[in-house]
Amino acid sequence: MAQSAANIDESWIGTNAEQVFGQHTGCPVFVTNDADAAGMAEMRYGVGKGEEGVVMLITIGTGLGTALFYKGMMIPNTELGHLLWPHGKSAEAYASSGARERLKISRKEWAERFNGYLLHLERLFSPDLFILGGGESKFFEQYKS
């Protein structure tokens, strides 16, 4: 059941997407959010393959998506971009790529904000591995200097 619609039309809220797509395609369908799907791919084929500890994938784009794994098993729908930040808004309203664009802040200032988000997640979950992806990941080379 679609519970939110951050990047799709709001008419999907309350829709059993698995049933709709399954009926139209005649195939079994599994629906998940983009961060969980990316996390499953990374754990099976990417840098998370074989990792047994706590692994967290973060998609950095319009918002902040998360996927959390422990001993190779996904803990679904973590939605950690919705954690409340000290200013009373969500972390993604403060530290996402969308926030950087909306607030017109420099990549340096954004990186400091995002680093604060990573430190917060590290305190909460002590992950053995962070995997960063999403639209902002194409700019990671710029953050090395």
Predicted segments, located by residue:
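Short glycine-aspartate micro-motif
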Residues: 55-59, 131
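Histidine/lysine/aspartate-rich catalytic loop segments that bind and position anionic ligands
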Residues: 69-101
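Short secondary-structure boundary segments
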Residues: 33, 60-62, 134-136
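Adenine-nucleotide phosphate-binding core of ATP-dependent small-molecule kinases
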Residues: 89-145
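Short, active-site-adjacent cap segments at secondary-structure transitions
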Residues: 1, 36-39, 65-66, 137-140
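Glycine-rich phosphate-binding loop and adjoining helix at the ATP-binding site
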Residues: 1-52, 145
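Short beta-strand scaffold segments in enzyme catalytic cores
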Residues: 58, 64-69
